Amino acid sequence: MMVDCQSSTQEIGEELINGVIYSISLRKVQLHQGATKGQRWLGCENESALNLYETCKVRTVKAGTLEKLVEHLVPAFQGSDLSYVTVFLCTYRAFTTTQQVLDLLFKRYGRCDALTASSRYGCILPYSSEDGGPQDQLKNAISSILGTWLDQYSEDFCQPPDFPCLKQLVAYVQLNMPGSDLERRAHLLLAQLEDLEPSEAESEALSPAPVLSLKPASQLEPALLLTPSQVVTSTPVREPAAAPVPVLASSPVVAPAPELEPVPEPPQEPEPSLALAPELEPAVSQSLELESAPVPTPALEPSWSLPEATENGLTEKPHLLLFPPDLVAEQFTLMDAELFKKVVPYHCLGSIWSQRDKKGKEHLAPTIRATVAQFNNVANCVITTCLGDQSMKAPDRARVVEHWIEVARECRALKNFSSLYAILSALQSNAIHRLKKTWEEVSRDSFRVFQKLSEIFSDENNYSLSRELLIKEGTSKFATLEMNPRRAQRRQKETGVIQGTVPYLGTFLTDLVMLDTAMKDYLYGRLINFEKRRKEFEVIAQIKLLQSACNNYSIAPEEHFGTWFRAMERLSEAESYTLSCELEPPSESASNTLRSKKSTAIVKRWSDRQAPSTELSTSSSAHSKSCDQLRCSPYLGSGDITDALSVHSAGSSSSDVEEINMSFVPESPDGQEKKFWESASQSSPETSGISSASSSTSSSSASTTPVSTTRTHKRSVSGVCSYSSSLPLYNQQVGDCCIIRVSLDVDNGNMYKSILVTSQDKAPTVIRKAMDKHNLDEDEPEDYELVQIISEDHKLKIPENANVFYAMNSTANYDFILKKRTFTKGAKVKHGASSTLPRMKQKGLRIAKGIF
């Protein structure tokens, strides 16, 4: 009898068993009744076989104490919840530490006391036969779990100089599983880490899981309606502040993208056969097909003329036009792919990434920071080459713009969405977009390509086009759109090279931070919300799938281009804007040029970016019955992530009102650094789009269409799949809650934080939430007031003790300013130019009541 894996599942309720909440689902599976021996002999078994259906009851862990979650690893591995182990190992850092997991696991299944940091070997006792200790099957399960942990997350054990967790694991295995393959692998990893130079070991451990301040079990109150015998859990890490990471230098210096030391590869041993849920198996098999080794290619021979050495031995700096567009795109793709493959996926978790600006957390996620730096470097290169040479006339500058458009098209053909987005962001930045004379000289064909490429990141229908492309092409061999250059398609087919895909990582960062913001860490008081971790796992799985796809690229580095790119001068926002104004004074700049060429697809309503208006939308796997979640569009939309990515600069030329509000330049005129990546990430509430710091322009800015990328994630190495889950919505009150965005009232920038407001929250409560997110711990709520931005000229002050949910203007944008109580009555609230996400249309999105 065979069970069909393709089955329908319906959630019917929950069960509480021993301090663990299980989601109960009914799964309808098809049973293929085998034919009789006679039928098989006659060859007619297929005709006579009966198709029967059976309904199975399935339980999956939804929430539990830390002790129970760790304890469930073994039974889950043995078959009751096939994806549980994978999700746990991927996300546990959000609610506990490696040391705690080992202590609880060994205490429960090793019958030993928790080891100290010095890893005392003598305290680990072999399995007790008196208690009917685990059989071989149980030992195999524990061995497989620990082996998977070592193989896939070896960095968890890199804790120089003593490596306490790894030594604890070695001691446990040595006494309970002597002579096993796991013991050999653990000893090998320990030897490798100990052999590293101290500096190398420290660099390997740059991004450990955040050490959480954990309360002892005795201090924790029992969960509501639950009476677990022992509650072992961690203090939830909620609403971490996410400030932008400085990426671009403030002065024109040579600063190549940082090269990061790769995490040491675990020993190449057979991986434990962790079973995955049926719905995840196709994705796994798909990802395995992507693991083909890249075909080595000979070094590229320059097909263009390079400057020759002069009499004094110096060479003239090569010009962009000397590098063919396909070569530039290939080199960008090579750089982007290498950095993306080095990204540690779980560092993208909202609870980790959004803490990077906190004191003591500067070491977090260096691989992600490297991708941010590369994105900014590409965008800066575009702006510098367009503005750096003041001797160029408009027609010559137009040729440079056309060259970059061609590079962008080649990036599209290579499925490099990261550099594609960086180039488009730079071309639509304030400093370049305003150059009327230059754009007039751009050929109509090039401009048409520019429009077509920009449509990829359009915010229409929640960035549906970019999501569809990612789903369609994420693991395909070639790009499929008609904009793919014919020669590129021909070259691909002739060489037979299979391409990878480099996504815009801001998409995932936004989604994960918003997921972290929208869903509770704990349910019923002290039970860890494991359903939230499953949804995060879906996103991280997509990252892993695309990382494996990047192995399909086969591009050789070109030394001359790499040297030229790394030596590119960096322009600050003020410098680029000044150069732009020198080329075409403000009175001559006109965004009408693009409009005259029907560039309606570039970016809608740039002027909207001047006022905070970002929308929080999202969707992950549907959890229809939960009252604790909100239904949203696919993916998360600007939340805490755009908090981190949403930096606004007080603009450079307040008189230049006709300019489109875009400037993805490295830093604002007042010296506050700002990033192309982060401004780009903001513009798309959920995957980041090309938002920009406004150069203090007025709301009369010309309208265009913001570009922003997005995408869809699915975990377990499943291919970019759906996910229509539940998260909060911005700019919409449904039921008794809503999401608002709160920024600080400052002159040199704004950082927005997403705040959940319920019908019970009064002004002091909301102010305290906003202060916590903005790290204003030393101040008191009484020192601040909450002001809603209705329009450019209209602000609404929320009364001191008013219920914010009912006092706010629900028809306007849910954008607020947290303002110090120092202004006189009647005075206008400051409003600096901002580079926020464009407001997204809410279509068919509803919030379930009582989400939190």
UniProtKB/Swiss-Prot annotation:
Matches recorded under InterPro entries: RA_dom, RalGDS_RA, Ras-like_GEF, Ras-like_Gua-exchang_fac_N, Ras_G-nucl-exch_fac_CS, Ras_GEF_dom_sf, RASGEF_cat_dom, RASGEF_cat_dom_sf
Annotated region (Disordered), positions in chain: 606-627, 665-711
Keywords from the named record: Cytoplasm, Guanine-nucleotide releasing factor, Nucleus, Phosphoprotein
Entry remark concerning the domains of this protein: The Ras-associating domain interacts with Ras.
Subcellular location: Cytoplasm; Nucleus
Organism: Mus musculus
PANTHER family: GUANINE NUCLEOTIDE EXCHANGE FACTOR, RAL GUANINE NUCLEOTIDE DISSOCIATION STIMULATOR
Modified residues (Phosphotyrosine): 752
Chain ranges of the Ras-associating domain: 736-823
Free-text function comment from the UniProt entry: Functions as a guanine nucleotide exchange factor (GEF) activating either RalA or RalB GTPases and plays an important role in intracellular transport. Interacts and acts as an effector molecule for R-Ras, H-Ras, K-Ras, and Rap. During bacterial clearance, recognizes 'Lys-33'-linked polyubiquitinated TRAF3 and subsequently mediates assembly of the exocyst complex.
Domain N-terminal Ras-GEF: 57-194
Keyword set includes Nucleus: yes
Post-translational modification: Phosphorylation of Tyr-752 by MET blocks HRAS binding.
A cellular component annotation (GO) from this entry: nucleus
UniProt protein name: Ral guanine nucleotide dissociation stimulator
UniProt keyword annotation of Cytoplasm present: yes
Domain Ras-GEF stretches: 324-586
UniProt biased composition (Low complexity): 613-624, 683-710
One GO BP annotation of this record: small GTPase-mediated signal transduction
Subunit structure: Interacts with RIT1 and RIT2. Interacts with OOG1. Interacts with TRAF3. Interacts with HRAS.
Main location: cytoplasm
GO molecular function: guanyl-nucleotide exchange factor activity
Gene3D superfamilies attached to this UniProt entry: Phosphatidylinositol 3-kinase Catalytic Subunit, Chain A, domain 1 (3.10.20.90), Ras guanine-nucleotide exchange factors catalytic domain (1.10.840.10), Son of sevenless (SoS) protein Chain: S domain 1 (1.20.870.10)
CDD domains reported for this sequence: RA_RalGDS, RasGEF, REM
